Curated annotation (Swiss-Prot):
The gene is UBL4B. It comes from the Eukaryota. One of its GO terms (cellular component) is cytoplasm. SMART domains: UBQ. Residues 1-76 form the Ubiquitin-like domain. Keywords: Cytoplasm. The lineage of its organism: Eukaryota, Metazoa, Chordata, Craniata, Vertebrata. Residues 163-174 have a biased composition (Acidic residues). Residues 141-156 have a biased composition (Basic and acidic residues). May have arisen from retrotransposition of the X-linked UBL4A gene during mammalian evolution. This is Ubiquitin-like protein 4B.
Amino acid sequence: MFLTVKLLLGQRCSLKVSGQESVATLKRLVSRRLKVPEEQQHLLFRGQLLEDDKHLSDYCIGPNASINVIMQPLEKMALKEAHQPQTQPLWHQLGLVLAKHFEPQDAKAVLQLLRQEHEERLQKISLEHLEQLAQYLLAEEPHVEPAGERELEAKARPQSSCDMEEKEEAAADQ
């Protein structure tokens, strides 16, 4: 399929790619054609920022689509790189691990299946599941109150009969 890639400064080019190409590969092609360093590129399709580790088909980019390129200024790039550790996307690292244990075609197929399964599972997550996960993680996290806060709360609220019974039980246990 052919894609039209437009720079905001007016330059444009047409590139022949497949839907299975990664966004990182498209950036490489744009870099060669329009002389824009990959690190400075932000690719947009229908207002959505394209992530390097995803494929064009993940964004439903079809033939004759138009991709916009936004260039990040060099000063911002230098600041961004200074504050971020250099890490590679999970899928790239996983691909390297798979390449050590499988033939190239098999590693690519396994990686594709893993990505597809991951995306499908993400689509199935409901708000209720996310809330359950958050509650579980918060329950595991030890809650530490600043010293003296409990005493202040106890003095501030009126004592109920339940509070009185708890105090009596605590005194009896001692």
